Amino acid sequence: MSFNNNLTNELNLLSQFNLSNEQDGIKIHHDAASELISAAEKLHDKGLITQKDGGYLTDLGRKAAEHTQALSSILK
């Protein structure tokens, strides 16, 4: 399995969440890059974030973000 651009955008967005504070969410503004808006919508549709424009991680989203950030640290 390779990481296509859409998946890469979703992984990049998951890596933006601050895992040390569950009260830190993110907000994707309407004038953000279309790829970022699309990634947020897809993560929301998959049940990983609470709002289509960001919000907070769900329980599943937190697990995904933890794995994403761990993988990023390993590969750096």
Locate predicted features.
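Accessory beta->alpha helical hairpin/"wing" motif in late/C-terminal subdomains of nucleic-acid enzymes
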Residues: 53-76
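Short amphipathic alpha-helical interface segments
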Residues: 1-38, 70, 74-76
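A short, conserved structural fragment
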Residues: 44-55
